[in-house]
Amino acid sequence: MNTELSLESIELSLYRYPKRSVEQLQAWDSADEYIINTVADLTLAEQSSVLIFNDSFGALTCAYNQHNVTTVSDSWISHAAIEQNLDENELSTEQVKVQDCLAALPENIDLVLIKIPRTLSLLEHQLAMLSHVVTSNTTIIAGAKAKDIHNSTLALFEKYLGETKTSLAKKKSRLIF
């Protein structure tokens, strides 16, 4: 299976956790790629504060580790995979904070990246927490497989964050802005 993610100016070796001698599954999906390509079009300052939700194996965290990154996930395996992939790519962990879904979110966030979870109650909890810390200057990009984005998903985004737009689908994934 492919373990090399090459997009824009990003070259990463990514593995699922635990790492196996023969990987059977890829550690990122087309939604990760779509998010990374979309963020590449933004002007992101060096010390930007990036908040990432539900980064399964660390593709987004590794891609933006040079910024002040806080990664929020309810999965211990995700936490372990993020640490493993940061080490695998010899990336600094100094500006990366990994926390669970119950911890308080940081203030003054410049960019929020959300991998939309399948559980709507988790998404609602995360959006409710997020609504208290984002400002009008915060850029929010959420992504998932197009088949996993429903009217109820969009309704939650609009309830907590205001008007939302969706992108065209690419590689069967879609973004919400």
Annotate each predicted stretch with a short phrase.
Residues 1-46, 56-60:
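S-adenosyl-L-methionine
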Residues 1-20, 144-177:
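Non-catalytic substrate-recognition/targeting regions of SAM-dependent transferases
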Residues 48, 99-116:
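A short acidic, Gly/Pro-enriched loop at the edge of an enzyme's catalytic core
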Residues 64-70, 136:
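Conserved S-adenosyl-L-methionine
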Residues 68-74, 142:
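Conserved SAM-binding motif I beta-strand of class I
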Residues 82-85:
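Conserved SAM-binding loop
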Residues 90-102:
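Conserved SAM-binding strand-loop segment of SAM-dependent methyltransferases
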Residues 123-139:
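A short glycine-rich, Lys/Arg-flanked "PGG" loop and its adjoining helix->strand segment in the class I
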